UniProtKB/Swiss-Prot annotation:
Protein name listed in UniProt: Triosephosphate isomerase
Primary location group: cytoplasm
UniProt EC number: 5.3.1.1
Gene assigned in the entry: tpiA
Reactions catalysed according to its record: D-glyceraldehyde 3-phosphate = dihydroxyacetone phosphate
Functional description taken from the UniProt entry: Involved in the gluconeogenesis. Catalyzes stereospecifically the conversion of dihydroxyacetone phosphate (DHAP) to D-glyceraldehyde-3-phosphate (G3P).
Subcellular location: Cytoplasm
Gene3D superfamilies: Aldolase class I
Amino acid sequence: MKKIFAANWKLFKSPKETREFFGQFKELAGKATGEVVFFPSAISLEAASESLKGTSIKFGAQNCYFQAQGAFTGENSAQVVKDLGGSYVLIGHSERRAIFGEGDALVADKVAFVQGLGLTPMLCIGETLQERESAKTFRVLETQLNLGLAKADKTKPVVVAYEPVWAIGTGKVATPEQVAETHTDVFNILKALGFETAPILYGGSVKPDNAAGLIKQPHVNGFLVGGASLEAKSFSEIASV
């Protein structure tokens, strides 16, 4: 299975900064050992599209609505992402769930809509620290996958990104043993649902100094990287493991 190295820039980088970043990154991208995907903020999607023309580097949106257009103030259109040449949409990130109240039913609608446009949804799942310490990790991930993929087409691509919420932007990293155990659980859940070919990415304070050890764990098919993807050299090192 091919590796995928995805960068979630969240609400960072202006269009100007986006162009400057790709001017640097394209010189380093040849070292990547898998597919590279960037999720810039909505305001920088067009800059990413222009910068990445003629390259094999993919890009997508951090969120979308489950309709192409309409009276949905503040939402993003996956159709526009497609028109710009994008390939992916990030769906169900823990910040969308926690800050904006997105539930599994809405996530499922978005996954199905994105697939219907011929784009690839990258479905984010993960447990909180309280859920892990209460031994509820498996149940939480099983529920998120069951409900989030409820309307998904098994014949079309989908990528799953496991991000323990307690390790996002905190500097805390799941141990290789925790990653191995949880990714094996996620694979088994996906297999039972008929999505055994879906790549499973790990996210949660991934950095150049821990990426090589994490990528060796079973069913880790790449990374979804936050802060460490904002610097070209740092992310290129991660994408080359």
